[in-house]
């Protein structure tokens, strides 16, 4: 649905060229939630602004439904933007308008008849759970309620695409979960394509089908959520994943391990997570198993387990145990200082 083809955006600053986005090629499929994650300055926000042509690319093309939007006329561009809703970190509500008025605003701009505006706004108020807040002003709302208004306003013109710019960054953890659940509901019930940017990996984990990692204007890794989480290739991606799966061991534990024993990382997927593999090798081989770290998370309805274990015993027995483990799970030896 959305395609970036060798897209670059260059700014001139102090006589130097700054590559905010550099040679990005990405495809976002219709009906999916696609996340773009990166630290500040990675180029995420610039890439989003290129989708609705608030910024024009210096090079490359951007297509929506196989149509090159970089060549659209002003009139065609105005029509395109009606298909794209957007929500922001800072909500961007009109403080002088009620909740009803904020949601109705894009419909008035589109010259929708008053009776249809009322019907649509009431429908959206119910959808986002704010039926009793129609006459309230933004200052009377919590942060989560303000973002619900922002989502309703973004949906007002029945867009095909919803762009989310750090939509949960200003919210507490509980409210973040509520907003992410609402966005999943939007995606599910309206079959809306959602393109979001964030610097928080737990947001990606909770909501995205696929994800791209940006650094210094470039996409350095991209793929299905499960693949990126379970097999991160770059150091930056590995650091993001560790913000959700923190498997670094304390120095005091590492010091003891370095005096003996071997560390292995075991990863389980799907039904493997329920198998008693460690108890089996402890019973059937002369090996002591010390679990140093354990974690199980769910990624797009698939379980992923991650264990760090220390094996102690005679080398021959350890090798027998490892041979059995390799038949059951993914196994990798880990140096103590690199755990």
Swiss-Prot record:
ATP binds at residues 38-45. Belongs to the ABC transporter superfamily. Methionine importer (TC 3.A.1.24) family. It comes from the Bacteria. Part of the ABC transporter complex MetNIQ involved in methionine import. Responsible for energy coupling to the transport system. GO terms for cellular component: plasma membrane. InterPro entries: AAA+_ATPase (IPR003593), ABC_transporter-like_ATP-bd (IPR003439), ABC_transporter-like_CS (IPR017871), ACT-like_dom_sf (IPR045865), MetN_ABC (IPR041701), MetN_ABC_transporter-like (IPR050086), NIL_domain (IPR018449), P-loop_NTPase (IPR027417). Its EC number is 7.4.2.11. CDD domains: ABC_MetN_methionine_transporter. Keywords: Amino-acid transport, ATP-binding, Cell membrane, Membrane, Nucleotide-binding, Translocase, Transport. Residues 2-241 form the ABC transporter domain. It comes from Bacillus anthracis. SMART domains: AAA, NIL. GO terms for molecular function: ABC-type D-methionine transporter activity; ATP binding; ATP hydrolysis activity. This is Methionine import ATP-binding protein MetN 2.
């Amino acid at each position: 649905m959305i395609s970036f083809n060798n897209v670059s955006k260059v700014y001139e600053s102090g006589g130097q060229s700054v590559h905010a986005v550099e040679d990005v090629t990405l495809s976002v499929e219709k009906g999916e939630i696609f996340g773009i994650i990166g630290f500040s300055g990675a180029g995420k926000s610039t890439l989003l602004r290129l989708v609705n042509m608030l910024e024009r690319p210096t090079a490359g093309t951007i297509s929506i439904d196989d149509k090159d939007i970089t060549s659209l006329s002003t009139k065609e561009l105005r029509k395109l933007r009606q298909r794209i809703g957007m929500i922001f970190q800072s909500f961007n509500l009109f403080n002088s308008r009620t909740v009803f008025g904020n949601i109705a605003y894009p419909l008035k701009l589109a010259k929708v008849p008053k009776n249809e505006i009322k019907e649509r706004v009431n429908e959206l108020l119910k959808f986002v759970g704010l039926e009793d807040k129609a006459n309230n002003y933004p200052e009377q709302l919590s942060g989560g309620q303000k973002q619900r208004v922002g989502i309703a306003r973004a949906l007002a013109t029945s867009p095909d695409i919803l762009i989310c710019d750090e939509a949960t960054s200003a919210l507490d953890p509980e409210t973040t979960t509520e907003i992410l659940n609402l966005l999943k509901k939007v995606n599910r019930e309206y079959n809306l394509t959602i393109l979001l940017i964030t610097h928080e990996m737990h947001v990606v984990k909770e909501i995205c089908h696929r994800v791209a990692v940006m650094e210094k204007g470039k996409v350095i890794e991209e793929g299905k959520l499960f693949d990126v989480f379970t097999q991160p290739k770059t150091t930056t991606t590995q650091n993001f994943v560790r913000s959700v799966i923190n498997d670094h061991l304390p120095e005091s534990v590492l010091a003891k391990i370095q005096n003996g024993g071997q560390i292995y990382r075991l990863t389980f997927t799907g039904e493997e997570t329920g198998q008693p593999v460690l108890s089996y090798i402890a019973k059937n081989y002369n090996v002591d198993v010390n679990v140093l770290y354990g974690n199980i998370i769910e990624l797009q309805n698939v379980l992923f387990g991650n264990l760090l274990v220390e094996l102690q015993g005679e080398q021959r027995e350890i090798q027998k145990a490892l041979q059995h483990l390799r038949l059951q799970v993914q196994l990798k030896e880990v140096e103590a200082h690199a755990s």
